[in-house]
Amino acid sequence: LLTSAGDKRSYYYHVPENYYGSWNYIPKDLVIACWWYDMREKSLAHFSGLGYRTIGASYYDGDDLENIKGWLETLGKTPGASGIIYTTWLAKYDLLPGFGDLVAKAERPKL
């Protein structure tokens, strides 16, 4: 688990310290998957600004595709963003065709 500079938590669950600066130890050839929807703009900008390629890890277990639309909009404006992955905790696949359609039509960022 990495955190971006915009995440000011002083701890993470049972970890006695924070993760601030953890990105300084990650090789630049790794792709960072940002999954926290509310922090997507800050996280993507942070890791992109450090030279990492990024992808969005959208939450798909909702009842509509609004979450995905927000991710695609932000990814389209993020240099170094190279895609989006489908993540589900509930094995919910009924919106998968619509997800694919949105991704196929999305604006592509410059790599």
Segments (PLM) and residue ranges:
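Substrate-binding groove of N-acetylhexosamine-processing glycoside hydrolases
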Residues: L1-L111
